[in-house]
């Protein structure tokens, strides 16, 4: 392991520990006995992440996983025809922040407002250690009145006609995520000439990590299919939904045999046909996750 890798690993570890300590202090200040089920679940999710065998360099965020599925291995860029991945990555950010206990939806109220009309509010402003996530979290925290999930996906993507809200756009997201993957040893950086201009590309350098990611997605809808989204790992469930919304899920299924492919797509369709409004009412669900799903499937 190089000294650079060691330094980056230590930095990530220190950031993660600092974030967890800050979040724990804030929860303690709010009253330990009154902590919600979501708080407990978010702590379990973070602990599960820490317990996984992968090194810090190869533990990927939802955004990085979706981008990795969309990148061409040798060329090092996403398809020029993919106009879905931009909004999909913003949806990943909202879910990632929710899974880390930073965001939640406002209470549904007596009249039970729908997922798409409920506002996103900041639950904790403790740093995540990820620059993009912290940037998005800062926007959510400082915005009054709050916005809905659908609005945040559009605002963070820059898809607004209101010039006063253009500052919400997160710029160069794909390039910044690719650089994160370069630092984690998954991609490398090259310059390619495209007739009239040069373009920075990020070809795959660690195929094992991508193959593990593809295998994880395939197994979720084949060998390890449980036919119940609430028994699936939340992060994996979100990955399947967001990979589909970003139009990159097909890349994970491309190597499958015809029968496996048909079964996998059938089961993904089962997930897409679920009603997020119904699913979010079940026990131990993450409402932001289902609100993002609703934004992309309604």
UniProtKB/Swiss-Prot annotation:
Effect recorded for residue 7 to A: Altered binding to coatomer
Protein name, entry field: Golgi phosphoprotein 3
Entry's localization field: Golgi apparatus, Golgi stack membrane; Golgi apparatus, trans-Golgi network membrane; Mitochondrion intermembrane space; Cell membrane
A biological-process GO annotation: gene expression
Organism name: Homo sapiens
Region (Beta-hairpin required for oligomerization): 190-201
One MF annotation (Gene Ontology) recorded for this entry: phosphatidylinositol-4-phosphate binding
Keywords carried by this UniProt record: Cell membrane, Disulfide bond, Endosome, Golgi apparatus, Lipid-binding, Membrane, Mitochondrion, Phosphoprotein, Protein transport, Transport
Lineage, top ranks: Eukaryota, Metazoa, Chordata, Craniata, Vertebrata
Binding-site residues for a 1,2-diacyl-sn-glycero-3-phospho-(1D-myo-inositol 4-phosphate), renumbered to this chain: 81, 90, 171, 174
PANTHER family found in the cross-reference section: GOLGI PHOSPHOPROTEIN 3, TRANS-GOLGI PROTEIN GMX33
